[in-house]
């Protein structure tokens, strides 16, 4: 039976799930990024690479796509990925521009790394390196807008 007047949903909001997949896959391929999240010590970057199982556990514990943290007895570093400020694209109104936010949350006791490095800024540097001027599912590239 043919359904008359059915249109496949055309919403740029549907690209969020694909963008999340691209972002989290890139994060799970970056060993420096994973070490900074997994190991709480000052020498986190000198530690062994994570196994596939440890990497996948980061997505459950440290990398969040829902902005909710659970309070438990372990002290972890977190990355919360969120999408906000959707506006019509000036050049192509079928697309929406939006802001992708990466909230970096680290316990103060875990900020200090070796050689005057600070964990939140090293995580920010890795995120910047992975995604600056990269293309996701939309028509443009990611551009750094700022940090708080």
Residue spans for each PLM region:
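Acidic-leaning, charged glycine-interspersed low-complexity segments
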Residues: 118-148
